[in-house]
Amino acid sequence: MEDINFASLAPRHGSRPFMGNWQDIGTSNMSGGAFSWGSLWSGIKNFGSTIKNYGSKAWNSSTGQMLRDKLKEQNFQQKVVDGLASGISGVVDLANQAVQNKINSKLDPRPPVEEPPPAVETVSPEGRGEKRPRPDREETLVTQIDEPPSYEEALKQGLPTTRPIAPMATGVLGQHTPVTLDLPPPADTQQKPVLPGPSAVVVTRPSRASLRRAASGPRSMRPVASGNWQSTLNSIVGLGVQSLKRRRCF
């Protein structure tokens, strides 16, 4: 069995395959180095331990002992405590004052709200002469509407409900006899026909060109040219009606 080179099937970084001893894929060795949180945390711890060592050495030295004695003589610790206590008490006093001011503002009566004066109506000098009429002199207008009679009243009186037609009119029983208006005139009178008056007759003399055209007969169609599409279209559609404008004086 022949040896198969599987390196040709592996992914490549340029001309170098990703297999063999080069197995550092995804580490800081690729792409010029990556950011490592572990190295950052270890560096911070080393820096803190270094500062602690230097501080302990300085505190335990002779200079540190002299500094501690001097602070004890000046009662530095008591001053720090007193300063912190005074600061805390000042903050508490300010808070108490703010709360007390809010309580007093709520307990004190509110000042009365000044209402604006009512607006004065200004009367124009033109309207001063007009006075409102007194109630005893007021006139009451009563309008009467003529409504049509009810159905029972119309039947009792025997009045027609529609305008009667002359050939179909019949007698109506009742107290009052109906009178029909707007009837056509009787057909006995014959109207004489009105003859129209004499009117002026205008006689026009035909021109010589029209006489020649009438004598020559109908116009013959133009010969159709074989190679011209306009002449073919004129032979199919025609040239239309030839109009002739003439001015005549009467």
UniProtKB/Swiss-Prot annotation:
Positions with biased composition (Low complexity): 206-220
Basic and acidic residues: bias regions: 127-140
Sequence positions bearing Phosphoserine: 124
Maturation propeptide residues: 1-33
GO biological process: lysis of host organelle involved in viral entry into host cell; microtubule-dependent intracellular transport of viral material towards nucleus; nuclear capsid assembly; viral release from host cell
Stimuli inducing this protein: Expressed in the late phase of the viral replicative cycle.
Motif, PPXY motif: chain positions: 148-151
Region span, Interaction with hexon protein: 48-74, 233-239
Residues covered by region (Amphipathic alpha-helix essential for membrane lytic activity): 34-54
Residue span of motif Nuclear localization signal: 131-135, 245-248
InterPro entries (UniProt xref): McpVI (IPR004243)
Site positions for Cleavage: 33-34, 239-240
Keywords, ordered alphabetically: Capsid protein, Cytoplasmic inwards viral transport, Disulfide bond, Host cytoplasm, Host nucleus, Host-virus interaction, Late protein, Microtubular inwards viral transport, Phosphoprotein, Ubl conjugation, Viral capsid assembly, Viral penetration into host cytoplasm, Viral penetration via lysis of host organellar membrane, Viral release from host cell, Virion, Virus entry into host cell
Name of the protein in its database record: Pre-protein VI
Source organism per UniProt: Human adenovirus C serotype 2 (HAdV-2)
